[in-house]
Amino acid sequence: MHKKYFIGTSILIAVFVVIFDQVTKYIIATTMKIGDSFEVIPHFLNITSHRNNGAAWGILSGKMTFFFIITIIILIALVYFFIKDAQYNLFMQVAISLLFAGALGNFIDRILTGEVVDFIDTNIFGYDFPIFNIADSSLTIGVILIIIALLKDTSNKKEKEVK
């Protein structure tokens, strides 16, 4: 018999990501001034202390009330989807846990300081990507995993229809 929910795994992932996110942000905020930067991998990765009071790329800068409301709605929706749509599906539960942790990590920053600490500064194929953090990475990986899970589910349904 398959497990319906992988609660322990899901909580462990979410707690690890939130703690890792918050610890790294704390280290950056307490040891570097905004704008300070150092190179980790030449021409590819820097650690740069940055603050963002908006979303990705500074979109909706200063709209904290909006972010509070939308984040609470998203967190509740993720719990709902975890319970309703991710039954027996460890892959989907991991994806939702990563999304939850990423949203919560940035939400904690917004509540405590009114802005998000960003510090991962990459240059990918000559494009200076916007500075981000562990929570943002968790959100991105979670979205990618959800897309993979949905594509796989769609593919499996088509295979069953053919048979």
UniProtKB/Swiss-Prot annotation:
Coiled coil: none
Effect of a null allele: Mutant in strain LAC grows similarly to wild-type in rich laboratory media, but has a reduced ability to survive in whole human blood.
Membrane protein topology class: Multi-pass membrane protein
EC number assigned by the record: 3.4.23.36
Positions in the Extracellular compartment: 26-62, 113-133
Pathway as given in its UniProt record: Protein modification; lipoprotein biosynthesis (signal peptide cleavage)
InterPro entries in the record: Peptidase_A8
Catalysis: reaction(s): Release of signal peptides from bacterial membrane prolipoproteins. Hydrolyzes -Xaa-Yaa-Zaa-|-(S,diacylglyceryl)Cys-, in which Xaa is hydrophobic (preferably Leu), and Yaa (Ala or Ser) and Zaa (Gly or Ala) have small, neutral side chains
GO cellular component: plasma membrane
Effect of N133 to A/Q: Retains 3% of wild-type activity
Record-annotated active site: D118, D136
Subcellular location field: Cell membrane
Cytoplasmic side: 1-6, 84-89, 152-163
Transmembrane segments: 7-25, 63-83, 90-112, 134-151
Biological role: This protein specifically catalyzes the removal of signal peptides from prolipoproteins.
Annotated NCBIfam families: lspA
Protein name: Lipoprotein signal peptidase
Organism: Staphylococcus aureus (strain USA300)
Lineage: Bacteria, Bacillati, Bacillota, Bacilli, Bacillales
